[in-house]
């Protein structure tokens, strides 16, 4: 992997393939790292690199990326890492492909920097629907590791950070009204479990004016069709 430093933050990233650029925003919750794609039923690192240049990153304090943790950290510090990496690589405009926590990452980028993105694919985006405690528990599990590191953050800092990240509603980084104003073409591959509620995917598809919902994709019977749908969608908007 290559590294990009911005202040005290070091982001590790990989570039694979050749073609129009795509920023990959990996699953894994607070542990979102590029190698998490390798365990997913649909892996863009396998399926897309013949036609696209893939920019895959480890988010701050995930994988081998590092950054200070403060009580003011929130979704926006991740957003600025992501857009700064694109600036560093001189990528003026690209596609987005994100799974799980990648859904809120994508929404935050699209509502703030719509001119930078041609299209976006959200795979089973996380969202809030009577499941907030599950996200608190997921965060706390990750936070224990960070607190135990040498010179790690305090419990108080991590508690504030947790609430900054997971106290929102719906898609966490965007309200229903904000999603309704996103004009960027969206393809949503529906979630259907505790962390990735079906209701979140459906609501995004209902609200965003240029969104398409693909309901069935994860099982072996549907994966090839889903792969074709993603590639066709990206090519259509390249």
List the model feature ranges, each with a label.
Residues 94, 98-100:
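Conserved alpha/beta-hydrolase "nucleophile elbow" surrounding the catalytic nucleophile
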